[in-house]
């Protein structure tokens, strides 16, 4: 009886239901993922998120600020006094606020703070063009120097030397380059921390800076990207830093001397035209008005002076002399010996 109850009567409807159950079960089994595949996919999506959190870079402004800001921590920089000798590889001019250095040569820069920054603070270095017409462009190395470099950061102009903790970034929005290094407290007996920077392209390189002046910005930042202090200085990468510094400082002194002389002296009149100065009385005749004429060269000045003295003398005795001189009878004829040529 039990076997009879378990067996269903074989008909067209029961066979159709049985066939559908068999087909759906095999289809579901074929679509089911292999064991452990779902967990592997979850691990795959979790790793990039954690990597992005560890390498999170704060969004940089479109145009970085170039004003000096000491902040609450008294952030400041100090450069070595290398002088203007031809043998120096880097030298800083206080008068110009400008660093002169050679290509790929290490430049030590001292970092000073009055109060220690928070734990994990970093020092960020980036460069921008000085002139407003170029400030929107990214400062990077020329194609020639990039082709000679096989490193991952070959397009970056600024390198940090002597530290394995340096990190190089490229902002996803502005494409500007920057490099960070962790802030280290000064050693015993020292008031500052020294970082080593090198600039990997000349200022005159075609396709790179192309003789356009640049500014380097050093900022003291927290791990979240908050700026605690900022210092800015101009940089020129050249073959002879001492010579170029001496030349530019000399040009600055010459321009300053010329401006001082111009302020002390009266404004020079225009040499192309004679400027008419107003006379003391506005009712005087036009012939009595005084004019000023600037003359170049002493000999020419003496010649005009003698001419002017003669004219002044004629003005004093003018009426008598004019009466004694006979006028010609015609504009085309000259009087010779007091008789007509006819």
Swiss-Prot record:
Record-level GO BP terms: apoptotic process; DNA damage response; positive regulation of transcription by RNA polymerase II; protein tetramerization
Cofactors required: Zn(2+)
Annotated segments matching region Basic (repression of DNA-binding): 319-336
SUPFAM superfamilies: p53 tetramerization domain, p53-like transcription factors
DNA-binding region(s), residue ranges: 68-255
Region annotation Transcription activation (acidic): where it falls in the sequence: 1-35
One cellular-component annotation, GO: cytoplasm
Location of the protein in the cell: Cytoplasm; Nucleus
Annotated stretches, region: Oligomerization: 288-317
Binding site for Zn(2+): 142, 145, 201, 205
Comment on bound cofactor: Binds 1 zinc ion per subunit.
GO MF annotation list: DNA-binding transcription factor activity, RNA polymerase II-specific; metal ion binding; molecular condensate scaffold activity; promoter-specific chromatin binding; RNA polymerase II cis-regulatory region sequence-specific DNA binding
Ranges spanned by the short sequence motif Nuclear export signal, renumbered to the chain: 302-313
Marked site positions, Interaction with DNA: 86
The entry's keywords: Activator, Apoptosis, Cell cycle, Cytoplasm, DNA-binding, Metal-binding, Nucleus, Phosphoprotein, Transcription, Transcription regulation, Tumor suppressor, Zinc
Gene3D superfamilies xrefs: 2.60.40.720, p53-like tetramerisation domain
InterPro entries: p53-like_TF_DNA-bd_sf, p53/RUNT-type_TF_DNA-bd_sf, p53_DNA-bd, p53_tetramer_sf, p53_tetrameristn, p53_transactivation_domain, p53_tumour_suppressor
Biased segments, Low complexity type: 271-282
Domain notes: The N-terminal and C-terminal disordered regions undergo liquid-liquid phase separation (LLPS) following homotetramerization and activation. Post-translational modifications, such as phosphorylation or lactylation affect the ability to undergo LLPS.
Role noted for this protein: Multifunctional transcription factor that induces cell cycle arrest, DNA repair or apoptosis upon binding to its target DNA sequence. Acts as a tumor suppressor in many tumor types; induces growth arrest or apoptosis depending on the physiological circumstances and cell type. Negatively regulates cell division by controlling expression of a set of genes required for this process. One of the activated genes is an inhibitor of cyclin-dependent kinases. Apoptosis induction seems to be mediated either by stimulation of BAX and FAS antigen expression, or by repression of Bcl-2 expression.
Protein name as catalogued: Cellular tumor antigen p53
Originating organism: Xiphophorus hellerii
Gene from which this protein is expressed: tp53
């Amino acid at each position: 009886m039990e076997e009879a109850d378990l067996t269903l009567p074989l008909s067209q409807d029961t066979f159709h239901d049985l066939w559908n159950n068999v087909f759906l079960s095999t289809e579901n089994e074929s679509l089911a993922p292999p064991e452990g595949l779902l967990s592997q996919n979850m691990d795959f999506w979790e790793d990039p998120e954690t990597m992005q959190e560890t390498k999170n870079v704060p969004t940089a402004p479109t145009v970085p600020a170039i004003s000096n800001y000491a902040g609450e921590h008294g952030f400041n920089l100090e450069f070595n006094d290398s002088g203007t000798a031809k043998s120096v590889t880097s030298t800083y001019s206080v008068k110009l606020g400008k660093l002169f250095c050679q290509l790929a040569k290490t430049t030590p820069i001292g970092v000073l703070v009055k109060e220690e920054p928070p734990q994990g603070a970093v020092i960020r270095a980036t460069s921008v063009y000085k002139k407003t017409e170029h400030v929107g462009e990214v400062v990077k190395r020329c194609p020639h120097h990039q082709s000679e470099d096989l490193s991952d950061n070959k397009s970056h102009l600024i390198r940090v030397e002597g530290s394995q903790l340096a990190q190089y970034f490229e902002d996803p929005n502005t494409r500007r380059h920057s490099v960070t290094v962790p802030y280290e407290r000064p050693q015993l007996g020292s008031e500052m921390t020294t970082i080593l920077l090198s600039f990997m392209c000349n200022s005159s390189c075609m396709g790179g800076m192309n003789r356009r002046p640049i500014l380097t910005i050093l900022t003291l930042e927290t791990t979240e990207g908050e700026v605690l202090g900022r210092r800015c200085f101009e940089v020129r990468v050249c073959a002879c830093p001492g010579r170029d510094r001496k030349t530019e400082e000399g040009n600055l002194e010459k321009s300053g001397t010329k401006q001082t002389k111009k302020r002390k002296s009266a404004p020079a009149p225009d040499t192309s035209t004679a400027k008419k100065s107003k006379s003391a009385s506005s009712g005087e005749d036009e012939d009595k008005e005084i004019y000023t004429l600037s003359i170049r060269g002493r000999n020419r000045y003496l010649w005009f002076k003698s001419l002017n003295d003669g004219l002044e003398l004629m003005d004093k005795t003018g009426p008598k002399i004019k009466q004694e001189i006979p006028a010609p009878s015609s504009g085309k004829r000259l009087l010779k010996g007091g008789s007509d040529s006819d």
